[in-house]
Amino acid sequence: MQHKLLINGELVSGEGEKQPVYNPATGDVLLEIAEASAEQVNAAVRAADAAFAEWGQTTPKARAECLLKLADVIEENGQVFAELESRNCGKPLHSAFNDEIPAIVDVFRFFAGAARCLNGLAAGEYLEGHTSMIRRDPLGVVASIAPWNYPLMMAAWKLAPALAAGNCVVLKPSEITPLTALKLAELAKDIFPAGVINVLFGRGKTVGDPLTGHPKVRMVSLTGSIATGEHIISHTAPSIKRTHMELGGKAPVIVFDDADIEAVVEGVRTFGYYNAGQDCTAACRIYAQKGIYDTLVEKLGAAVATLKSGSPDDESTELGPLSSLAHLERVSKAVEEAKATGHIKVITGGEKRKGNGYYYAPTLLAGALQDDAIVQKEVFGPVVSVTLFDNEEQVVNWANDSQYGLASSVWTKDVGRAHRVSARLQYGCTWVNTHFMLVSEMPHGGQKLSGYGKDMSLYGLEDYTVVRHVMVKH
């Protein structure tokens, strides 16, 4: 397994403290990797800053060609990446290979094309004798912090737009799941000029802080928790860096009486528990109208009970383990607190799986109330709650009564209601009669404490640029 850092076009061993990397399906240590030292963090940023002098002036075509080459090598090594992601994250191998790798390849290919479509406003004379033009230029060095739930996917979401816009990047994957990012570094070093992409390994305190606080870093992009986002925003405030934050979610799933219940059950069974529920957009907070509530709880409970947890190598496995022992304990604690309320009923699941690995049973909780912690706080595991509501006004207010604002869905056959409710929901994305669908052409990002800035789409590309005005006297 590739375990070296990429700094200035060279693969080098870390000079800091060694950290274990686990296989969450067994609890075994896969290997130990040395963190980047403070000197190596500085070297990576300095290399990126030096490379920016030329990379920032390359043509969109040249950048697109590099991104397309990277997409090709990821596709060619898809099985290798899927196996690494499966071993390090516990994802079912078939899901990593069939679902994630094609989407990752598409992200790089999309931004290769988008790089050639980005432009400013046409020139014009807004002052007599002067011509103005608007430029969209790269910022410089971008520090990208990727999470542990989709390590390679999130690396792609961050690298592709930043590079397409002409920036240079220092990427720090989560210390829990670094293996695919390190493999990506190995393949990228022969495609991009030295220093354009740098990949480090280490914890937030030892590597993340010196990276995001470095005076040569002009932008920090984070996908992570609210707490981490708060820390980085305050940590970078003295140097007035641009920040791009995707900080989690608690997606409301609004099911009206007229919804297609079979579609709802199938959708939540899939999209509430995909990746063991470790997804910011997971369909985890159901609001069911009183006329459909009982039937939905019964049918969904039966469907969730059929979800198969097991070895990531088994083709029939639908749910792998959680990412770490610490996270398993957090999920378990959240469910135990829900049980302790007395009014929340466990329909299925509600316990850790026996045996090796960090497995938690797919869980459905009914009878949750709006103010319950299980409704208000992100669990980030295979846990879905169901809350009864009376009418449209009530459920819209409840759905918006959340610190999160990333994703939501509305299930109804009434087209007017679908438009009306979608317009009022305070979420970056609202799906109607589906959930979880993402495409490279459409923006992904939140409101409120879910953060700001967009991933994917041309809006995502624009986030990695600075708008500049050039005026020429004639």
Curated annotation (Swiss-Prot):
InterPro entries: Ald_DH/histidinol_DH, Ald_DH_C, Ald_DH_CS_GLU, Ald_DH_N, Aldehyde_DH_dom, Aminobutyraldehyde_DH, PatD. NAD(+) binds at A146, P147, W148, K172, P173, S174, E175, D209, S225, I226, A227, T228, C280. Pathway: Amine and polyamine degradation; putrescine degradation; 4-aminobutanoate from 4-aminobutanal: step 1/1; Amino-acid degradation. Signal peptide: none annotated. One of its GO terms (biological process) is L-lysine catabolic process. Transmembrane segments: none annotated. The keyword Lipoprotein does not apply. 4-aminobutanal can spontaneously cyclize to 1-pyrroline, and 5-aminopentanal to 1-piperideine. NCBIfam families: ABALDH (TIGR03374), PRK13473.1 (NF010000). This is Gamma-aminobutyraldehyde dehydrogenase. It comes from Escherichia coli O1:K1 / APEC. The gene is patD.
